[in-house]
């Protein structure tokens, strides 16, 4: 008998579900897995593990609205594909959500055309039909499908998807001290510090627009901000993207050291800034990369940027590389947005909550796009979020 169980942090086969998610969907189509768990079964989302009695089959992730329900992710355990389970699962799931919809890659010339045709045939066999409406998700063009006879207004689809993505972007604004206190409270009561650092790095990794064939340089300081960068470097390396690390100095926070060691074990190249690397040398080096990830200073930085970091930041700003700043632009005051010099980013990925300095007029001169990512940080004496 097919049955569905809610997925949360206590699900017994959570690691298997995570691995299937990584196997079934390319990284450009994935959101961070911790977010899947964080907002699963909340705010109009169902994240369900699927079983045939006690036999695990896979998972389904659905956005549930008043007008329609939309399958965002659906995957069957690798060894059970072609076994008829996909049809049985959809048959049972449509009893729960009669106005069920999904999206597939359109049938047009592509490297995976055969796979696209098989997917279309599968869903048609299971009572879905194309709706002549195309949408873009995670930068990928898709074609909507719905149960036979079903009409979908594009605005209902967009409303559903927007609600989901808005659900893990925190809108609250904190001071640097308030953010530090929230970090400490979360680590003391909910999430291990290494796990929280991993979540931060994973969030930055998914926001970045890097692809296979790109060259990425992670420029890292000595604090936890650098640790986020080491997580990103390892994830890039896993995906086959060329990545290197430039250390300002060989000094690490405890958690940063942990993730830097993983990078070393996995063969990621790194260099250490030295006196021979003047502005021109750095500029020439930076121009050879497609992306630079700025992890030099975190939100706790204040005062003036001194050499050799001053010349390094100037070279980043003058280079042709696209720049992503982790949590805050290095050199910027997290409360005021002021800086004598700071990294100019194409995108800044704020972690947890927006910081006051990031939304000032002064900061806007240095930030191309500002994105804030919820990683489950909880403020004491507030409405605690699922972590």
Give each language-model segment a name.
Residues 206-295, 304-325:
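Nucleotide and nucleotide-moiety/phosphate-recognizing core
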Residues 76, 82-95:
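Conserved acetyl-CoA-binding loop-helix of GNAT-fold acetyltransferases
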Residues 49, 55-63, 68-75:
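Conserved beta-strand in the GNAT
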Residues 1-31, 155-163:
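Short amphipathic alpha-helix that is part of the acyltransferase structural core
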Residues 24-52:
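Active-site rim helix/loop that mediates acceptor-substrate recognition in acyltransferases
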Residues 171-213, 379-387:
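Positively charged, low-complexity intrinsically disordered leader regions
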Residues 96-114:
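Conserved GNAT acetyl-CoA-binding A-motif
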Residues 170-180, 289-387:
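YjeF_N-associated NAD(P)HX repair module
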């Amino acid at each position: 008998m097919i049955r569905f169980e809610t997925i949360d942090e206590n699900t017994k086969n959570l690691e298997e579900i995570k691995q299937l998610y990584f196997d079934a969907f390319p990284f450009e189509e994935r959101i961070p897995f911790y977010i899947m768990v964080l907002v699963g079964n909340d705010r109009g989302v169902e994240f369900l593990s699927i079983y045939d009695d006690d036999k695990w089959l896979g998972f389904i992730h659905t956005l549930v609205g008043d007008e329609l329900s939309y399958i965002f992710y659906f995957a069957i355990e690798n060894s059970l594909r072609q076994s008829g389970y996909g049809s049985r699962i959809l048959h049972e799931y449509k009893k729960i959500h009669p106005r069920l919809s999904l999206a597939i890659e359109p049938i047009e010339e592509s490297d995976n055309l055969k796979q696209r045709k098989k997917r279309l045939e599968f869903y048609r066999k299971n009572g879905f039909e194309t709706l002549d409406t195309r949408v873009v998700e995670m930068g990928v063009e898709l074609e909507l499908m719905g149960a036979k006879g079903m009409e979908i207004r594009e605005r209902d689809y967009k409303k559903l998807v927007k609600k989901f993505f808005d659900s893990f972007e925190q809108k609250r604004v904190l001071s640097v001290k308030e953010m530090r206190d929230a970090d400490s409270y979360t680590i003391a009561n909910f999430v291990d510090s290494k796990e929280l650092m991993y979540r931060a790095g994973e969030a930055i990794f998914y926001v970045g627009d890097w692809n296979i064939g790109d060259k990425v340089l992670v420029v890292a300081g000595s604090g936890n901000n650098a640790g986020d960068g080491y997580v990103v470097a390892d994830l890039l390396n896993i995906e086959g993207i060329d990545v290197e690390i430039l250390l300002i100095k060989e000094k690490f926070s405890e958690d940063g050291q942990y993730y830097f060691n993983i990078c070393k074990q996995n063969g990621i190249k790194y260099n250490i800034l030295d006196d021979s690397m003047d502005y021109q040398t750095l500029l020439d080096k930076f121009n050879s990369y497609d992306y630079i990830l700025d992890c030099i200073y975190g939100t706790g930085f204040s005062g003036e940027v001194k050499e050799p970091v001053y010349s390094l930041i100037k070279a980043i700003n003058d280079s042709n590389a696209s720049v992503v700043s982790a949590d805050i632009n290095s050199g910027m005051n997290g409360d005021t947005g002021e800086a004598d010099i700071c990294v100019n980013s194409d995108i800044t990925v704020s972690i947890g909550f927006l910081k006051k300095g990031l939304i000032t007029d002064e900061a806007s001169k240095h930030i191309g796009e500002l994105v804030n990512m919820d990683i489950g940080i909880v403020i004491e004496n507030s409405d605690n979020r699922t972590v």
